[in-house]
């Protein structure tokens, strides 16, 4: 879709939501339910992350074998105990009402267990050589990419784009309506859903999870309920689509170079997986 198409589409979404009033809309439970954004094609994806982790592990194992560690595992644990941090938030805060009722602004602690390394613990000798092999794997995966200029250019622009999004009068009105709604249910009047999600009152632990207190869960339920009532996530998403489309048009060459860098990276990963995987 062209940038102009994105802008027109976002305007249509904004107008449709505003005109629809309180009638029932499609329930939004995850950010993906809102649809793609213009900058998505220029950015790193969860699949990229999974494939890069696999490719990196294969390269590290190869390097470690060259350093005298022939049985180094693909998914090793560190010599000491480490904390695995889990991140499950979205740009729009919590969206799933069922999850809010049960976990508040946190998540099922069993998810953390699933992220723990499956391999054996590294020996001290392996751990001594691991950093150099990890750095070498990164260099190989990033070969041919200008890291300072081109790598994940869309991500470097995201901060400026989000500043423009927050200045959008329609979004500011939407966030104000959401804020009033949450306060009217007896909770803190947060300026936006991100402030609610990151409230220190939830006492996140070292892994990022919260304590799931009754107050936290009740606040999260009010948060999601008010988002649905006022179509906060939809309006926010539409505003982001508009601003991203404008930014892509203004910096077309840089975005194109960033996309080419991402394609180079993906091709390198595919080659590593083909040869070693």
Regions found by a protein language model. Give the residues of each.
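Secretory targeting and sorting signals
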Residues: 1-24
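Cell-envelope/extracellular polymer assembly enzymes that use nucleotide-activated donors
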Residues: 20-277
């Amino acid at each position: 879709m062209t940038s102009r198409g994105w802008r027109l589409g976002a305007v249509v979404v904004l107008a449709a939501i505003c005109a629809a009033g309180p009638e029932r809309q499609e329930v939004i439970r995850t950010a993906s339910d809102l649809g793609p954004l213009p900058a998505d094609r220029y950015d790193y994806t969860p699949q990229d992350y999974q494939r890069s982790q696999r490719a990196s592990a294969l390269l590290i194992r190869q390097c470690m074998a060259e350093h005298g560690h022939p049985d180094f595992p693909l998914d090793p644990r560190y010599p000491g105990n480490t904390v695995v941090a889990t991140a499950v938030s979205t740009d729009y805060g919590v969206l799933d009402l069922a999850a809010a009722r049960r976990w508040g602004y946190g998540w099922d602690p069993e998810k953390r267990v699933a992220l723990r390394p499956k391999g054996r613990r590294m020996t001290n000798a392996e751990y001594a050589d691991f950093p150099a092999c990890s750095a070498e794997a990164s260099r190989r995966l990033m070969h041919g990419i200008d890291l300072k200029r081109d790598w994940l250019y869309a991500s470097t622009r995201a901060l400026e784009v989000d500043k423009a999004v927050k200045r959008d009068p329609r979004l500011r009105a939407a966030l104000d309506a959401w804020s009033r709604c949450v306060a009217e249910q007896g909770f803190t009047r947060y300026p936006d859903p991100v402030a609610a999600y990151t409230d220190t009152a939830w006492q996140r632990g070292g892994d990022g999870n919260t304590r799931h207190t009754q107050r936290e869960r009740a606040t999260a339920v009010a948060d999601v309920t008010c988002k649905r009532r006022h179509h906060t996530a939809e309006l926010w998403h539409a505003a982001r689509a508009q601003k991203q489309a404008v930014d892509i048009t203004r910096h077309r060459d840089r975005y194109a170079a960033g996309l080419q860098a991402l394609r180079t990276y993906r091709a390198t990963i595919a080659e590593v997986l083909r040869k070693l995987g």
